[in-house]
Amino acid sequence: YFENNSMKSFHQGIGWDKTQSEYQKELFPSKDGYVYKRYGYIDKTKLRYAGNFDIKPRGDYKKQRQFIKDEVCGYTPSEIAVAVGLSAVVNGRIQDIVHTPNLIVHFYGDSSRGKTTAAQLAVSVAGVPDIQRTSLFMSWNATSNAIIARLKMNHGMPVAMDEISKYNGNQMSAVVYALSDGRDRERLNKDATLRTTDKSDSFTTVIVSTGESTLIGKCNN
């Protein structure tokens, strides 16, 4: 027999819904665990996120606001980090209008200067800031294909990639271009026709990077 359960819907994308379907408009989790829709709230039991990132709300909202007030406001580097993280929401929205590339912000300098902490602060406005498989805070220790695959269908949530020296792949410049462009390189089908891409293959966000060397210097090498 069939158990009488309510129907549940899932979405893999996060941020601004690029498909503009009838049911999904804005897919941002709020502090109370609901997914926000343009004209109201969608009950979380009806719409669940099944994508790449751990974005489940944690902690206490009031304590987080107090932390921002006490520890961030008035200290310019921390204010910049939070502003960069929040700008992903704006960037994800305006790209279809002004067609700007993804913003890549690279924090560089000597070790133990707070680069990683600043990157964690930037992504903490949207999700878990610890390095783990489903976190918005990632490591450069990955292949270019894995990096691009992790970012797909993200249209408004900031991501961070820690320590650029850990990237051992080739063609660093090509990776940076792909991150800025918001999609992988164009490819051909078996019949030599250009493979079509859709919104599920793209991403529009802000990417925070860290390292002791500059991003341009790494590309030149």
Tell where the protein language model's regions lie, with residue ranges.
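Switch/connector loops and helix/strand junctions flanking conserved nucleotide-binding motifs
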Residues: K115, N168, L215-C219
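AAA+/P-loop NTPase substrate/partner-engagement loops
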Residues: Y108, T117-M172
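Ser/Thr/Asn(+Pro)-rich, low-complexity disordered segments
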Residues: L27-P29, Y36-G40, A83, P101, ...
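Short, glycine/acidic-rich hinge or "gate" loops at secondary-structure transitions
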Residues: H11, Q95-D110, L188-D201
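Conserved glycine-centered beta->alpha loop in an early N-terminal alpha/beta scaffold
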Residues: Y1-T76, A149-R150, N154-M157, N220
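Secondary-structure capping and boundary motifs in well-ordered enzyme cores
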Residues: G74-S78, D110-G114, A118, A149-G156, ...
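P-loop NTPase catalytic core of nucleic-acid-dependent motor ATPases
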Residues: V35-Q132
